[in-house]
UniProtKB/Swiss-Prot annotation:
GO terms for cellular component: cytosolic large ribosomal subunit. It comes from the Bacteria. Signal peptide: none annotated. Keywords: Ribonucleoprotein, Ribosomal protein, RNA-binding, rRNA-binding. Pfam families: Ribosomal_L27A (PF00828). GO terms for biological process: translation. This is Large ribosomal subunit protein uL15. Residues 23-35 have a biased composition (Gly residues). GO terms for molecular function: rRNA binding; structural constituent of ribosome. Residues 1-57 are annotated as: Disordered. Belongs to the universal ribosomal protein uL15 family. Part of the 50S ribosomal subunit. Binds to the 23S rRNA.
Amino acid sequence: MRLNDPKPKTGSQHRRRRVGRGIAAGQGASCGFGMRGQKSRSGRPTRPGFEGGQNPLYRRVPKLKHFTLINQKQYTTINVGKLNELKAKSDVTLESLMAEGIITSNDGPLKVLGDGELTVALNVQAAAATQSAIAKVEGAGGSFQSTES
């Protein structure tokens, strides 16, 4: 092999099939489409999902509004406005909120949302938070620390 005359590997390229050029050519008369039927007519093939006139699967199955994510994370959420009930400079964790009675059910790691106003400086330790929630916590003189890596 030389760089000035590259050739494809032998057997890797096939000749184009010429159909309808007589029986001796191998693809004469019906051109490989068989005898009769829908698949031998012009305008074939049928569209994807076509089942010969039967009500197709995509019409038999009901329309679903959404689908559930397999690995969806479930968070225990709290809005920033609810944190005003806590003492200044206190640590805010899921356990401390459960002890104070602000959160009643533990649905997973804590996520802080940004609805409401915060006037107390707090040290928030949560798995996740929205950007507006972090801005409000730091704006009130507190700090946010992520517990998830």
